[in-house]
């Protein structure tokens, strides 16, 4: 339907949608001009002008179309019957953003209208080519000059040509666009046909219905403040939304009615929600209801999601801001309620703080420590418990209160014999370390024998001499007594030799508490000295934590794996931090970064353990008394297994001592063929496996009576278990432990063929690095070549140099040895069997030299001979280490004729004096050599004339 209506250009970013009421501001001149358009002529004889007649005709047609009723007979002055066209404007900013005036349906130069209420000479503003047919509900006087009109949207319109643009209120031709389905005043027959729903339209309708329903639900919630305010400000529109939403269901009936309802719902929701101007323009431009539903459902869903997120963020921020205040108020209310009910907690915050204060005041602290504690107590009393610093300060004070400032363990000073008995019961051998510990215990006992009166007199005299001018003790002037300082021992040895258990035995012998601190993998200096309290999660260092856990200030502290402590890095140097702890002249005033005042560590007995000394810094090593613990020999392992391991594993596996019998030869076979280690850990595992196997055999031999297992005591009384043999034999080990892990073919050959000899084959002696020794065979051969020496068997640099020295000595003494070989025409190959095992060291020099001499002279070497020693280019035999292990290894291999350097005779004498060899050395024929010529004489009973060294 076409009509002519007054044209009202809306303010910027303003859109009037059908079915929605809105206030629009007008100037006084514009309001008067609009009313004059519908004013009756004063003279009854004067007819309406042509423009007025067209305007009145259009208004009458629209009134009939929209079924508007007059409320009085006051002619066209009744404001409720005045109908106008409201068109949104395109601002200059929007024109610049789009880059062209015709963007978004803007008119050409003919459709540009002036801003209402201004002179026509001012800058024009473009308007959209579509708008809304509105009726003026009422006029309102907003001030002395301006007016406001309340307009109600009736339908969409399409803007045509301007009819009159001379006045303040222009008129224009419009086309009313109710919908695209033909429901207008001029609808044809096709409008009677019922439209159908497509799948896409149904899906969009469901989204629209769900979004609208969720908006209403959110508005009903108490915490949805944003939606509540919107709904409250648009009460009329909100009521219309509820009415249309009730009509609109998930299963629509009449498609025509449902479309009308959905179209009206989109317009109403776009008016309620704070949507953008562009979104409202897009909905207003959608003349087709399906198109309007599609755009509206998309816009509403997006805006609804954004508003839900905004509501959630606002709620979260508000809750976090008020959390502390709410907690404080709740605590106060809870305390008041408990007081009224008489249910107050006797152990409240104040009571705990009072108890902590009393505990701190009762400690015997130094003046510096007492000053720090007093200051922190004053601080914490002024803080509210909700303050973050409160818990930090309280943790610090609790840490100080839990430290053993004046708590110590009274040493159970036993006699030297009693202490030795305790150490011997826990460990076999280790006589040198036991000797050092007994020395300390003896000194401690002698000091304790002084009378209490003498000690009191000395303390009184020392206190009087160190008093300051005010009669108070001056700690800075008090001399430090180092006479009673405990030793700082470093036990160095391979794994499993009993370093950790030895420290426990020392604590048991003294009656002191034991504390173990693992230093392996410590890479941060703060783990030793502690963190400063300014850091989040700060805590004391390992030593302060250890004292806190053990509860006394004089424990035996084991510094385990001190050789594996980290070196200098960007976290500091932990090894350097240990210098103060392990210095007897400094650890009395050890300052932890967390405590931040001196703590006395001088009363602790520090025992450190390490596997080697190479990784320990020299300054740190200098502060400790090093005691070497060598690996156990096979004979020592035999005694340890008999005395400690077998009874322990027998009991652990539910057997009695007499129910498992492992002879010495079986234990020795386990040590040599199944375990080769410095300690006894793996040996204990193998013995445990043997005991478990015997436990299975013993359980099988038990008789069953009526399905119940007969007890061992009952069976013993009956004389049962005749089929059970408690004795373990070597033949049983294969079934229990499997095949032998280590085989000594060379030793077996020496035992089975004692008279067989081979040219160029010699038995050396090697220390295996696990506390054990054994044979190290060398094989030499020659072939035509160019005088090259080839070495195989995974030999290290040192042993390769020893081989070169040996060959050079043979070449230089070839004439004296009666060797006529042309060394430039032969290649020499020296091989050490067991090529997968690395071999290194200078102690095989004598053996390799003898192999070369045997090769070139063609003389075989008896397999019953073994030797060790380093050799120089002049043929001098130098001393080597590991003599005890090498001799015992040779004995187990069946070799009893040994050649040692003369300088190692003292080592053999010392072992015989200590008796740690179990009488093995007395059964061996040991020869001592000083030069290589002595070796040749002992092997082949030949005398050689060495070369005369020229002195010219």
Swiss-Prot record:
Entry keywords, A to Z: ATP-binding, Hydrolase, Nucleotide-binding, Peroxisome, Protease, Serine protease
Domain Lon N-terminal: 5-304
Presence of keyword Isomerase: no
Residues the record marks as active site: 843, 886
Annotated Gene Ontology cellular component terms: peroxisomal matrix
Residues at which ATP binds: 493-500
Disulphide connectivity of cysteines: none
Domain Lon proteolytic intervals: 756-942
Catalytic activity: Hydrolysis of proteins in presence of ATP
Entry-linked PANTHER family: ATP DEPENDENT LON PROTEASE FAMILY MEMBER
Record function comment: ATP-dependent serine protease that mediates the selective degradation of misfolded and unassembled polypeptides in the peroxisomal matrix. Necessary for type 2 peroxisome targeting signal (PTS2)-containing protein processing and facilitates peroxisome matrix protein import.
Record's protein name: Lon protease homolog 2, peroxisomal
Source organism (scientific name): Yarrowia lipolytica (strain CLIB 122 / E 150) (Yeast)
Lineage, opening ranks: Eukaryota, Fungi, Dikarya, Ascomycota, Saccharomycotina
């Amino acid at each position: 339907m076409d009509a002519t209506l007054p044209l009202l250009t809306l303010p910027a970013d303003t859109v009037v949608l059908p079915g929605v009421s809105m206030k629009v501001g007008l100037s006084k001149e514009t309001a008067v001009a609009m009313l004059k358009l519908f004013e009756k002529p004063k003279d009854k004889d004067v007819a309406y002008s042509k423009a007025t007649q067209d305007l009145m005709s259009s208004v009458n047609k629209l009134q009939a179309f929209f079924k508007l009723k007059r409320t009085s007979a006051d002619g066209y002055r009744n404001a409720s019957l005045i109908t106008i066209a409201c068109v949104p404007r395109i601002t200059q900013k929007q024109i610049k953003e789009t880059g062209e005036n015709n963007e978004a349906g803007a008119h050409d130069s003919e459709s540009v209208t002036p801003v209402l209420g201004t002179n026509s000479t001012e800058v024009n503003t473009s308007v959209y080519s579509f708008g809304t047919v509105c009726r003026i509900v009422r006029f309102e006087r907003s001030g002395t000059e301006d007016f406001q009109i309340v307009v109600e949207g009736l339908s969409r319109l399409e803007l045509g040509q301007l009819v009159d643009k001379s006045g303040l209120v222009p008129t224009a031709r419009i086309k009313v666009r109710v919908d695209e389905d033909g429901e207008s005043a001029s609808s044809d027959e096709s409008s009677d046909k019922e439209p159908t729903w497509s799948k896409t339209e149904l899906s969009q309708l469901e989204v629209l219905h769900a979004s609208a329903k969720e908006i209403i639900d959110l508005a009903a919630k108490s915490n949805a403040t944003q939606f509540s305010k919107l709904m409250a400000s648009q009460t009329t529109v909100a009521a219309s939304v509820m009415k249309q939403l009730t009509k609109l269901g998930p299963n629509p009936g009449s498609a025509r009615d449902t479309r009308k309802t959905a179209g009206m719902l989109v317009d109403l929701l776009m008016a309620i929600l704070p949507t953008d101007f562009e979104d409202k323009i897009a909905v207003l431009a959608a003349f087709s209801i399906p198109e309007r539903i599609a755009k509206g459902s998309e816009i509403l869903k997006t805006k609804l999601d954004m508003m839900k997120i905004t509501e959630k963020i606002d709620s979260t921020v508000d809750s976090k801001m008020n959390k502390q205040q709410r907690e404080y108020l709740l605590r106060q209310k809870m305390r008041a309620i408990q007081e009224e009910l008489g249910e107050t907690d006797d152990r409240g915050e104040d009571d705990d703080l009072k108890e902590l204060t009393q505990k701190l005041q009762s400690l015997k602290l130094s003046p510096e420590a007492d000053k720090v504690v007093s200051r922190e107590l004053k601080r914490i009393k002024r803080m509210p418990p909700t303050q973050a610093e409160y818990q930090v300060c309280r943790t610090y004070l609790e840490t100080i209160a839990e430290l053993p400032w004046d708590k110590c363990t009274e040493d159970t000073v036993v006699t030297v014999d009693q202490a030795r008995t305790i150490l011997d019961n826990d460990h076999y051998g280790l006589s040198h370390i036991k000797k050092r510990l007994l020395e300390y215990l003896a000194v401690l006992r002698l000091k304790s024998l002084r009378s209490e009166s003498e000690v009191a007199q000395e303390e009184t005299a020392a206190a009087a001499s160190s008093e300051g001018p005010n009669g108070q003790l001056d700690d800075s002037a008090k001399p430090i007594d180092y006479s009673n300082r405990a030793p700082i021992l470093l036990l160095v040895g391979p794994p499993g030799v009993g370093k950790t258990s030895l420290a426990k035995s020392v604590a048991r012998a003294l009656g002191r508490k034991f504390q173990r601190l693992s230093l392996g993998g410590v890479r941060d200096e703060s783990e030793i000295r502690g963190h400063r309290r300014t850091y989040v999660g700060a805590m004391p260092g390992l030593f302060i934590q250890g004292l806190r856990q053990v509860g006394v200030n004089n424990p035996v502290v084991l510094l385990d794996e001190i050789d594996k402590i980290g070196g200098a890095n960007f976290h500091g140097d932990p090894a350097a931090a240990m210098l103060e702890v392990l210095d007897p002249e400094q650890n009395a005033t050890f300052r932890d970064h967390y405590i931040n005042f001196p703590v006395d560590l001088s009363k602790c007995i520090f025992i450190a353990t390490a596997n080697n000394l190479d990784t320990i810094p020299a300054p740190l090593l200098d502060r400790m008394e090093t005691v070497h613990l060598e690996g156990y020999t096979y004979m020592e392992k035999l005694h340890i297994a008999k005395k400690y391991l077998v009874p322990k594993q027998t009991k652990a596996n539910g057997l009695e001592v007499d129910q498992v019998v492992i002879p010495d030869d079986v234990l020795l076979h386990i040590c040599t063929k199944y375990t080769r280690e410095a300690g006894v850990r793996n040996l204990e595992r193998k013995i445990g496996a043997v005991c478990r196997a015997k436990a299975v055999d013993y359980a099988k031999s038990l008789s069953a009576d009526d399905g119940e297992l007969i007890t061992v005591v009952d069976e013993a009384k009956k004389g049962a278990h005749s089929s059970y043999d408690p004795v373990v034999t070597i033949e049983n080990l294969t079934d229990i432990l499997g095949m032998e892990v280590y085989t000594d073919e060379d030793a077996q050959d020496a035992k089975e063929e004692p008279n067989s000899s081979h040219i160029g084959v010699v038995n050396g002696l090697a220390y295996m690095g696990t506390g054990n020794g054994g044979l190290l065979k060398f094989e030499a051969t020659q072939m035509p070549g160019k005088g090259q020496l080839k070495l195989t068997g995974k030999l290290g640099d040192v042993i390769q140099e020893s081989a070169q020295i040996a060959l050079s000595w043979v070449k230089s003494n070839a004439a004296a040895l009666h060797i006529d070989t042309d060394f430039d025409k032969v290649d020499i190959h020296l091989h050490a069997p067991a090529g997968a095992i690395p071999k290194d060291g200078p102690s095989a020099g004598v053996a390799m030299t003898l192999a070369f001499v045997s090769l070139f002279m063609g003389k075989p070497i008896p397999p019953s001979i073994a030797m060790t020693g380093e050799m120089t280019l002049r043929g001098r035999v130098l001393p080597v280490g590991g003599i005890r292990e090498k001799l015992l290894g040779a004995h187990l291999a069946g070799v009893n004729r040994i050649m040692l350097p003369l300088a190692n005779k003292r080592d053999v004498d010392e072992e015989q004096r200590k008796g740690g060899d179990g009488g093995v050395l007395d059964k061996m024929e040991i020869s001592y050599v000083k030069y290589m010529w002595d070796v040749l004489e002992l092997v082949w009973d030949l005398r050689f004339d060495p070369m005369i060294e020229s002195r010219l």
